[in-house]
Amino acid sequence: MEKRLQEAQLYKEEGNQRYREGKYRDAVSRYHRALLQLRGLDPSLPSPLPNLGPQGPALTPEQENILHTTQTDCYNNLAACLLQMEPVNYERVREYSQKVLERQPDNAKALYRAGVAFFHLQDYDQARHYLLAAVNRQPKDANVRRYLQLTQSELSSYHRKEKQLYLGMFG
């Protein structure tokens, strides 16, 4: 168990190095490998094969902390990588960012990335929700402010069109 935690951390560090080098596909591969090492160790997730084979020893609180931190970091870093790759898979960015936010609801980077994903998925209400939370945590971040402004603009445009539609129907 300790070996799997260490291997996962090593893969995560390799992923971080690949990210710094701009090798996003390699980084994604390393983060996925890290998560695979952790699969089955997380006591909060149901086992795919319950009561089959010997149960492993329970994780210590320190090991559980390492497990969750490594998982969260990998998901956050996967979302960052995916935003750098063409074409961007915004569904996955959303999914990974929300996994981070399940454990760290105040994670500003995950809030921003979720907002960007929802913006590009054209769910502007959700984008606004996440971007407002991100701007509250990082009020000076120009990227957060820019996406929030773009989202507000799309929402205003949508509401104008909706109003005109209803005026045409009932006017």
From Swiss-Prot:
Keywords: Repeat, TPR repeat
Alphabetized Pfam families for the sequence: TPR_19
Superkingdom to which the source organism belongs: Eukaryota
Positions of transmembrane segments: none
Stretches forming TPR repeats: 8-41, 72-107, 108-141
PANTHER family for the chain: ARYL HYDROCARBON RECEPTOR INTERACTING PROTEIN RELATED (PTHR11242), TETRATRICOPEPTIDE REPEAT PROTEIN 9C (PTHR11242:SF14)
Family designation: Belongs to the TTC9 family.
Name assigned to this protein: Tetratricopeptide repeat protein 9C
Source organism: Homo sapiens (Human)
Lineage: Eukaryota, Metazoa, Chordata, Craniata, Vertebrata
Designated gene of the protein: TTC9C
